[in-house]
A protein has these predicted regions:
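Metal-associated gating/positioning segment near the N- to mid-region
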Residues: 1-35, 52
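Structured loop/turn residues at beta-strand edges in well-structured enzyme cores
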Residues: 5, 38, 63
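Active-site neighborhood of phospho(di)ester-bond hydrolases with catalytic His/Asp-centered motifs
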Residues: 11-14, 18-19, 41-44, 156-157
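Alpha-helix-loop-beta-strand connector modules within alpha/beta enzyme cores
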Residues: 22-39, 85-100
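Glycine-rich, flexible loop/turn motifs
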Residues: 36, 42, 199, 203
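Active-site beta->alpha loop and helix N-cap motifs at the rims of alpha/beta catalytic domains
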Residues: 46-51
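Histidine/acidic residue-rich metal-binding segments in metalloenzymes
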Residues: 52-207
Length: 207
């Protein structure tokens, strides 16, 4: 499908399962890619950080992995601030970059309950549970963790001006910070959630 659409290279996230290893995740995705007609590579998504995971990084480097994604959200994927700090330091030693999904998980879950209590259970409630400060606080926290680790860091799918401001403050302090956004955050607004097909626009972070 990628080649038919004119895409000649794909970088997919090979996601570690809780209780599993990075090597297992890499091998699983390698098997999925068997017979692929285009060039491909893998980012690694780390769902569990411990001494065993840290010890695997040199092997991942040998296999060509240069970036790892961490999540501040989702029970099956998120890691705590201490793990982010340790992973940043370990990745730097390998010349790799840590990418992070930034949202405050505890706060947004509280807000989900508040929104539900108001009777908002459809798409229109999604951005109310995840307003801009939910991302901005997580970005600010990540910037300080990276500062303490002395490591570069990459924020994925940045969606708010407030989050951008926090990253700019970190850069002004001399930190090495990389950012990305996505077309939907530049071209669409949360007004989409009020539409009849609003469910199509549910994503996290929201519009």
């Amino acid at each position: 499908a990628a080649v038919l659409g004119g895409t000649t290279a794909v970088l997919d996230f090979a996601t570690q399962e809780r209780g599993g290893t990075l090597v297992q995740a890499f091998d699983t995705w390698q098997e999925k890619a068997r017979g692929c007609s285009c060039n491909y590579g893998f980012h690694m998504a780390i769902a569990e950080w411990n001494d065993k995971t840290a010890a695997e990084l040199p092997e991942m480097t040998r296999r060509g992995v240069t970036s790892y994604k961490l999540y501040m959200v989702y029970d099956a994927l998120r890691v705590d601030d201490g793990a982010i700090y340790a992973a940043l330091k370990a990745a730097k030693n390998e010349g790799a970059l840590i990418d992070v999904h930034c949202e405050n998980w505890d706060v947004l879950n509280r807000r989900i309950q508040e929104v539900k209590a108001r009777g908002l259970t459809g798409p229109a409630g999604h951005p109310l549970s995840r307003p801009a400060p939910v991302e901005a606080e997580a970005v600010a926290r990540l910037m300080r963790i990276a500062e303490l680790a002395g490591s570069p860091v990459y924020v994925v799918h940045l969606s708010t001006a407030e989050g951008l401001a926090e990253a700019r403050r970190a850069r002004a302090r001399g930190q090495e910070v990389y950012l990305e956004t996505c077309p939907q955050y530049l071209l669409l607004t949360d007004a989409c959630y009020a539409a009849e097909d609003g469910v199509k626009f549910v994503m996290s972070p929201p519009l």
